[in-house]
């Protein structure tokens, strides 16, 4: 039986665009040919993500997105997801100013980024021209863009 479950919620932040965001995530999963998924996405503040970053990565600082994959990683790209994404809207507000982009563009980009990690992609650098994962990320963003 194919499982298709997507849960969204907020921790310590207000978010008003749940329907649009839900549909955006479904479009990303469809674009990436994800056959089966159990995915939870938490939109949060810096305090919430910093606690998780400290507990699981031993980094006592906030970050943009954390991904937690509950499937066995085999070094290959998987077309199933069982995991969680934690995304700090507070952090994205800062980075959107730094990169001179809309905050919702950063939300979409970081959501795609986290999903790519959950299906097995990794990157060593932040080179958007040459890192396969980041090239794919930007392609998916272009193709599924502007839902807010």
From Swiss-Prot:
A GO BP annotation: rRNA processing
Location, primary (coarse class): cytoplasm
Q: Which GO terms describe its cellular component?
A: cytoplasm
Q: Which domain of life is it from?
A: Bacteria
Q: What class of enzyme is it?
A: hydrolase
HAMAP family to which the protein is assigned, alphabetical: Endoribonucl_YbeY
Functional note: Single strand-specific metallo-endoribonuclease involved in late-stage 70S ribosome quality control and in maturation of the 3' terminus of the 16S rRNA.
Protein's name according to its UniProt entry: Endoribonuclease YbeY
Species this protein is from:
Borrelia hermsii (strain HS1 / DAH)
- Entry's EC annotation: 3.1.-.-
Q: Which UniProt keywords apply?
A: Cytoplasm, Endonuclease, Hydrolase, Metal-binding, Nuclease, Ribosome biogenesis, rRNA processing, Zinc
- Its family? Belongs to the endoribonuclease YbeY family.
Q: Does this UniProt record's set of keywords contain Cytoplasm? A: yes
Q: Name one GO molecular function term.
A: metalloendopeptidase activity
InterPro entries for this protein = MetalPrtase_cat_dom_sf_prd, YbeY, YbeY_CS
One Pfam match, by short name? YbeY
UniProt keyword Metal-binding, yes or no: yes
Against NCBIfam families, the record matches this protein to: rRNA maturation RNase YbeY
Where does this protein reside within or beyond the cell? Cytoplasm
């Amino acid at each position: 039986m194919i499982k298709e479950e997507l849960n969204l919620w907020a921790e310590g932040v207000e978010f008003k665009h749940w329907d649009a965001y839900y549909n955006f995530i479904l479009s990303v999963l469809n674009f990436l040919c994800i056959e089966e998924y159990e995915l939870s996405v938490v939109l949060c503040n810096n305090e919430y993500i910093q606690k998780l970053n400290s507990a699981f990565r031993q980094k006592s600082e906030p970050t943009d997105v954390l991904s937690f994959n509950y499937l066995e990683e085999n070094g290959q790209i998987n077309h199933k997801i069982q995991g969680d994404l934690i995304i700090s809207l507070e952090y994205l507000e800062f980075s959107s100013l730094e990169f001179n982009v809309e905050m919702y563009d950063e939300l979409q980009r970081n959501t795609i980024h986290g999903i790519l990690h959950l299906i097995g992609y990794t990157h060593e650098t932040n080179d958007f021209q040459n890192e396969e994962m980041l090239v794919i990320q930007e392609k998916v963003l272009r193709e599924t863009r502007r839902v807010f």
